[in-house]
Regions:
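C-terminal or internal capping secondary-structure element at the end of a domain, subdomain, or sheet
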Residues: 463-486
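Short, low-complexity, charge-dense intrinsically disordered segments
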Residues: 10, 27, 38-45, 51
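Detector for small/aliphatic-rich hydrophobic stretches
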Residues: 19, 54, 62, 66-73, ...
Length: 486
């Protein structure tokens, strides 16, 4: 790559292969590496016109996966007209490769009061989104990633379209502050979870369409978004393959595809993508030799044997009450908390309907440090859904039809959003939030004389869970598990 950048072997360099290598290289998120690649992007020509190479590239094999979210928004020309593709991209060179909005420095930025207000609103939005996802079944969503994507989209929205989008997304800050707020929250999350989290944003634009510098500048500086040209008009299938390839690389192959064949149309002009990859281990891993099948109660009179992870004595934060149990499990260094809420006197559906950001915040304050015997089921939860109906019902209907105003993106054609797809996956295992383990009879630790027995925290009924970054007070994922064996 260095040789190519110096111009010594450009004649033998396939640009799409270099781009593939760049995205698959484990070092590609390092600022110095990104700077080198950015400096030679224009010399490699139009990086987005050809499908990415299918080489396996360099892949990290040591990561443990906690969860992934990927969201895709697709904008099409609402006037039905298409623009003639040009042989080369009109995207300015300086926007050819995204630059990180993470910032630098060893100190964590402290969220300002207005940013905490937006984080609280994001939590309320996430809970509402979960309520509208696969009711009564296992489900998981990343409200944070959805909110981030909608904030990116809002950078190009104007008039009633911008107002409706902000209302539906529960943005509590004015447009002039919303991008700074999300940049700041993203910085806190990324710096806190450095080495455990990868956050990637990209915008894919029809070749020949000239986006406004102001729009691209917001996406580049506030969201670190890469901007790439694609030929939706003449090769929508190739565009699907390219975006799916990006998806697979950003999610380390866990989500190999988000777009089905035919999902992109010749009328498509812009696609926004966002991927969140988390890798974290428990502060104290569960001993796999103690894991065993136990009953998980699907209802008061029906149960199913399910693999459970068991720790006979663990220091936790928890709330044990007649009506509700809450358990906090931390990753190494306390950087991330997975919070489990188990209602005992009402159904999970009823409990979920009563949840709000304010109630969750109040419940979290009631948890106290304690010693506990923990029984937690192993589980994997995955959800894939369209957000179009959800956002329409909440006031954002104009952005999906010919009333949409996205003149902040371009004046060359009328744009509207075709659909927004959201996919999320979370795995919980003994070592952290992944990894397989054998099961065997548990070993019981005897209680020393005079010491009270640990509180039993048994997550053996349908439960609500939340993956929480405490420094920014951001819910990265919220979900429900009604049957961990399903």
């Amino acid at each position: 790559l260095t040789a190519a950048c110096r111009g010594t072997h450009l004649a033998h360099c396939a640009p799409q292969a270099v781009l593939t290598w760049y995205f698959e290289c484990p070092l590609s998120t390092e600022p110095a590496f990104a700077s080198v690649f950015s400096s030679c992007a224009s010399r490699l020509g139009d990086l987005g016109t050809a499908p990415l190479a299918n080489g396996q590239g360099l892949k990290s094999t040591c990561s443990k996966l906690l969860g992934i979210v990927l969201m895709l928004g697709v904008a099409v020309g609402c006037d039905g007209r298409s623009t003639k593709a040009k042989p080369a991209s009109t995207i300015p060179t300086e926007f050819a490769v995204g630059r990180s909005a993470q910032g630098s420095g060893a100190h964590l930025p402290v969220p300002l009061p207005e940013q905490r207000r937006q984080a609280q609103a994001n939590l309320g939005f996430a809970v509402e989104l979960l309520r509208n996802t696969a009711e009564g079944k296992n489900a998981v969503v990343s409200g944070f990633s959805v909110s981030l994507e909608l904030a990116m989209l809002s950078a190009g929205a104007q008039g009633d379209t911008a107002t409706g989008l902000a209302d539906a997304a529960q943005f509590v800050l004015p447009q002039s502050q919303i991008h700074d707020s999300f940049r700041h929250l993203s910085q806190v999350v990324q710096r806190t979870l450095r080495g455990n989290l990868s956050l990637a944003n990209a915008i894919w634009i029809q070749q020949g369409l000239t986006p406004k510098h102001a729009f691209l500048d917001v996406l580049r500086t506030q969201y670190g978004a890469g901007v790439f040209p694609l030929d939706f008009e003449h090769d929508p299938g190739g565009a699907v393959a390219t975006i799916n390839g990006w998806t697979s690389r950003q999610t380390r192959g866990l989500i190999p595809m988000i777009l089905q064949e035919g999902a992109l149309k010749p009328e498509t002009k812009i696609a926004l993508t966002n991927a969140l990859y988390i890798n974290a281990a428990w502060s104290k891993p569960f001993d796999a030799t103690r894991s065993m099948p136990l009953k998980f109660w699907l209802s008061d009179d029906a149960s199913k044997l399910t693999p459970f992870m068991i720790d006979n004595e663990r220091e936790v934060r928890a709330l044990a009450s007649p009506g509700l149990d809450i358990l906090f499990l931390s990753t190494a260094g306390g950087q991330l908390e997975t919070i489990f809420m188990v209602p005992k006197l009402e159904s999970l559906l009823s409990f979920e309907k009563s949840l709000s950001a304010a109630r969750i915040t109040e419940l979290l304050k009631q948890a106290v440090p304690m010693r506990a015997l923990v029984e937690l089921p192993r589980y994997t939860v995955e959800s894939s859904t369209s957000l179009k109906a959800f956002l329409r019902e909440r006031g954002a209907s104009k952005m999906f039809d010919d009333r949409a105003n996205f003149k902040g993106i371009t004046d060359e054609t009328d744009l509207c959003v075709d659909d927004i797809f959201h996919r999320a996956l979370v795995r919980v295992r003994e070592s952290g939030i992944e990894a397989a383990a054998a099961t065997a009879a548990p070993m019981i630790i005897p209680i020393s004389g005079g010491r009270p027995p640990p509180t039993v925290m048994r997550i053996n009924r349908p439960f609500f869970f939340m993956i929480w970054e405490p420094n920014s007070e951001t819910a990265l994922f919220v979900g429900r598990v009604v049957d961990p064996s399903n």
